[in-house]
Amino acid sequence: MGKNTKPDVSQIAFITNQKTLIAACDYLQPPDLNGDPDKCPASLHARYSRIKLILTDFERNPSVFLTYNLDPSEIRLLHEKIGMLTMTERNFDWSTTKDFSSFGNNRVEVFRITRMPMRNNQKAKYPWAISIRAGTSENGKFKAEQEVRKFLSDDEIQKFFIDIVAYLNVWEMTHGAPFIRNVIEPYKAERRKGIQEKSRKAAEPPTSDDFEIYDFD
């Protein structure tokens, strides 16, 4: 860990030196057993299930500490893209923004991850950069107030995201198994029962009760 930081038992992965630190922490939440209108009913995550990324700049006084929450699907997306780009000379630029205006706040946070494998016609030792910027929105324009950036090598960023995804897989198996067993499978069993009942009735020969009898006298 970096200086002036306390151990966090929810910490999944971290990379640090004397200047900066990047860490990932478990802010995951299991699915709501009663369902969530904003998520697929069979999703293994609650609406606000997240991986919290932390960036700290120790060189400033006081140190700058910024965080950004990523959806598990965003973590997996980045993991896949990083794996495909490593050992190539391709550039990469991905970002996501959170606007808190709907909460009556003009705060804006921006997470960005870039790759620039060549600098000044030479292979970069640390081609990746992960940054978090925090600021405000004024008249539709973003005004940055704080920023922390961490440079990483191909190996460092791969190990970082591999550790996160490995943890994510175990977490989903741990919480997903009882959810599937206690919620999804009973629902499917009831659905099968209903389908079988309809099929059984459709296969039965008609009886006199199925016909209307008219008296023409």
Task: Enumerate the predicted regions with their spans.
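Compact, well-ordered interaction domains used in eukaryotic information-processing assemblies
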Residues: 37-44, 54-100
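Short, low-complexity cationic-aromatic patches
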Residues: 42-47, 68-72, 119-123, 149-158
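Intrinsically disordered, low-complexity regions
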Residues: 9-12, 89-97, 107-111, 208-213
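N-terminal, helix-rich and Lys/Arg-enriched segments in bacterial and organellar proteins
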Residues: 19-32, 62, 72-79, 109-116, ...
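Mixed-charge, glycine-accented linear interaction segment located at domain edges/termini
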Residues: 133-217
